[in-house]
Amino acid sequence: SRFKIGENIRIKEGVLKGNNAIFMGINENQRVSVLLSMMGRKLNISMPSLSLQAY
């Protein structure tokens, strides 16, 4: 992966575009897991790695 676990990233595509998150890992389907803070909650979501950029 081009990101390190715990690295701050920015979502650059989709409905969450512009949000910052923390890179948590990558699965066997090449989807990444990120931790996103929204509305006072932490959400662990999965998305294509091409949707992310370093922050």
For each feature predicted by the language model, list its residue ranges.
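Ferredoxin-like alpha/beta domains used as RNA- or RNAP-binding modules
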Residues: 1-55
